[in-house]
Amino acid sequence: MSYVIDRRLNGKNKSTVNRQRFLRRYRDHIKKAVEEAVSRRSITDMEHGEQISIPGRDIDEPVLHHGRGGKQTVVHPGNKEFTAGEHIARPQGGGGGGGGRGKAGNSGEGMDEFVFQITQEEFLEFMFEDLELPNLVKRNLTGTDTFKTVRAGISNEGNPARINIIRTLRSAHARRIALSGSSRAKLREAKEELARLKREEPDNFGDIQELEAEIERLSARIHRVPFLDTFDLKYNLLVKQPNPSSKAVMFCLMDVSGSMTQATKDIAKRFFILLYLFLKRNYDKIDVVFIRHHTSAREVDEEEFFYSRETGGTIVSSALKLMQEIMAERYPSNEWNIYAAQASDGDNWNDDSPICRDILINQIMPFVQYYTYVEITPREHQALWFEYERIAEAFSDTFAQQQLVSAGDIYPVFRELFQRRLVT
């Protein structure tokens, strides 16, 4: 008996369907493991997947068996060691689910946990599951949809510029074999017979001439089969796929004042790294505006936003004023979905907190889809938090605020802020 052993590592993705079915079946286990991994890892450590363990008892297939009801008459052998109601001790060592600790035993059976690895893409999929930018709507629609061109297979008709040379030559080769296959076989036999006659019967001129004529006739028939026919032409088929024309921008406002300790700044940076990762993975096209502020605010690039060491006093309104100016200049609200995320320790110049409230209520909140504020402090809230609470009362659907105490709070708070909401 012959055996064919496929040693390819998931060649041609042939077991992808089975893997996706497995991931759906044990989604709860995987999601719990991902949440634990996020709280354990650094937010920047997302370049690889995660090892998932599933208890052996949870991967058992359901079986049909006889119930415990009914009346049975059974004779059991007696024993001198156990009586009714006693519990049998758990075997030492090799029992299933053991963590590798304890002494070895000479008895006991069980099943270890099932351990497998999920990829980075699968890890991020579970990490950002059920998250979205709230209130994302289409902007600047004038009755025409936008489209993107995507590959949709092979067609027998199309633009010469889109001809698929490999598929065309393959089709032509198959056609030539089909049309001239029998003639080639006869030609091969005729040549072999001619060679035999010339070798064994060189004086048999009649048969030799007849075979030479047959060979010439078969060769002419084969050459009449065209190398390329219009039937062989294959073209790459491109179709237009509707593309939602939503345009979105996210403003990231980070406090880098002197009151922000290095630990507090690190938590703020981790929050924005998680937000940036979420945006770039879930949305193809979205603008991100980075603003750092102390007594003054500046728009910076991604590198400077996360790694600059500049610091100073605290005037939060400077960042809000700059955001409003950029909105008015580059992101009109009738064309753009505008979002903002602000992180601070809540320490602000007292006279500035009411100014922040007025700017938000009158110049920013009426034009944004969603505004989030996270306050990173283990202490009691200060004036800025209470001013923002008044904003949350006025804009309950589009304003949210949360408190962060430690790095372990980042992911739960992030999920709370961007949890997918039911559309009513």
From Swiss-Prot:
Residues 85-108 are annotated as: Disordered. Residues 92-108 have a biased composition (Gly residues). InterPro entries: UPF0229 (IPR006698), vWFA_dom_sf (IPR036465). It comes from the Bacteria. It comes from Pseudomonas fluorescens (strain ATCC BAA-477 / NRRL B-23932 / Pf-5). This is UPF0229 protein PFL_5654. Belongs to the UPF0229 family. It holds the Pfam family DUF444. Coiled coil: none annotated.
